[in-house]
Amino acid sequence: MLVGEVKVVGTLPEGPVLLCGNHNSYRDVFLFGMIRSSARLLVHPLVFSFPFLKKWALRWGFVQVSIDDAVALLKQGQTVAICPTGLVEALGDAELPFKTGAVRIAQQAGVPMVPVFFHYGNYPGRWVTPFSITVQNMILFCLWPFYRRGVTIVVGAPMDPAGDVRVRTRELKASVVALKPEVSV
């Protein structure tokens, strides 16, 4: 599934947290487990509409996106992971807006949000931008051996979710983007 080295930079606090990461590959969902092996990932309901995918998603501990279910898991002491954009971004620049669900989940559960940035070793470049997000993702799905070699996972400092949901969502996105490693050309 992965080609190249996987490197995790940073550590998590003890106890339940909401991991909030950028989403530039379908492999991100598995990489949250490199941060905390017991993390439960919130995934799009479409995953559960296909019998084959549903079987594996349940086996891997994925949970259909639901604020109530996520809050319940966190209150049980589990770690939950979410990609607040809800969509895969082909270029890895975290340009899509974050949805407010992550902040609302953390507020209701009373747990910190931990920003996470997945940085893959190779991105396709701007040539894919004329295409829709769906087409970009299909291109990357077909060409993943060329465009997703190795990954660095950067874990940020925990954030208190208290405050205005929209403001905290913007701050969460800024914290995730700030974790992007500097890459020399």
Residue ranges and their predicted role:
Residues 1-7, 137, 182:
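N-terminal membrane-anchoring alpha-helices
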Residues 11-69, 92-94, 124:
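Catalytic core of membrane glycerolipid acyltransferases/transacylases, capturing the structured
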Residues 16-18, 79-83, 114:
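Residue-level preference for the first positions of well-ordered beta-strands
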Residues 58, 74, 107:
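Anion (oxyanion) recognition and catalysis
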Residues 73-103:
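Catalytic-site beta-strand/loop segments enriched in glycine and acidic/polar residues
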Residues 93-164:
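A cross-family acyltransferase "interaction/gating" segment
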